[in-house]
């Protein structure tokens, strides 16, 4: 399949960005624990996630289970359904059949039970996000230790005939912190059509490199550290031979698959210098950036339109110029129109410029257009 064909077939869903950065919070089916803790150091700061622990009525800490990779895929499908309904603030009504269709799963009784179980786990299992702080400049939502998050609320509406369940509809609503991030554009595009067909470990690897390689064509990581990044902490994965065997299966699944910013063309395993581990090298062919056919006058006109709608700022102007040069004019104007409509509806609680920055990148990625930005998700914009 060519780059152009991949771009035409691209179907992107906007997932909440924290979820994509921490997809490791979803365990594989082999995980037997009733809770789990994950930590990651960034500079001098430690971020920590605790899944499946809560206090009972007597104040005792209890374990209630963990979220697993199939639940992650259902969550992304819910993001897709929510967006298709116009991004409502309240409950969304759907059905298990629609959920299966969005995930491209063959319908059947066993699948209905599986999807119900995943919806319940997204509703019932708490997550503590420790060390995540509010940052006013990019509207990063704080999730505190004493405020555990459950991804969704859900209500099942079952129709029965002669004691047999013949239809199951459900209503869902995102946690208010997840919903606010979605509305603010604090999101990461995801290829639901790809992840829905991957095995569990391949899903974790795919989502990890899709985030890390957003602005890279190559990425190398030692297998031990990679498995730590993915939350794969089973005793078997302490041994390089087990990690290698798992990754060899992943390579068969992932090579040639489209990421959101290009095609994953190669994954190779090479021994480290001390021969005690091996490096995993990922190579991406980025989607080709369209050659700009705009004159200087056309670029200036588009920049002026963006400044009229979004405001003027020295930092913003460089972003506007890059967008004007690399993005089709009709796409820019569509994104500006959407931004104005979102503001009128009261959905934008941050700045218009930042919302536009997120949205234009999403629209471009959905069409396979590389905008040539060194940073993404609004990092180049003043937020007012």
Question: What role is predicted for each listed range?
Answer:
Residues 1-298:
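Charged, alpha-helix-forming regions
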